[in-house]
Amino acid sequence: MWPGHEEVGHGGATLPQVDELLAVDMGCVGDDLSCTERQVSICAKDNGGPYDYGMVTRLVELARANAIPYAVDIYPHYSSDITVAWHAGMDARGALIGPGVHASHGMERTHFEGMKATIDLVALYLELD
């Protein structure tokens, strides 16, 4: 899922029932976070609660095994389309990843390496060649 409406609270509300959701959004960069603009962020938990442990573990293992630069962070003031889907009644495992982004909403900045790391991790997760 490539979110587009999580900020207004309906991005994942009308999805068909699936077993698993992988949202690709932005990863936060900040003083109290591990991620940089050159990494893919794997979010373990946000304001909506923890993401699926099995999915998060698989993402970390894929990144580590394939030398993809990554960081695992917790975003207590952040929410994704997966949270919206859960609130709409979907019973699915979920995980959230994205390139590290500095200064969200004002003038978002990331790096090509962070974008590449995110795309590479999505491709591995989906078992694309």
Spans of model-derived segments:
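Acidic/histidine-rich catalytic neighborhood of metal-dependent amide-processing enzymes
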Residues: 1-45, 82
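Active-site-adjacent substrate-binding region
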Residues: 41-129
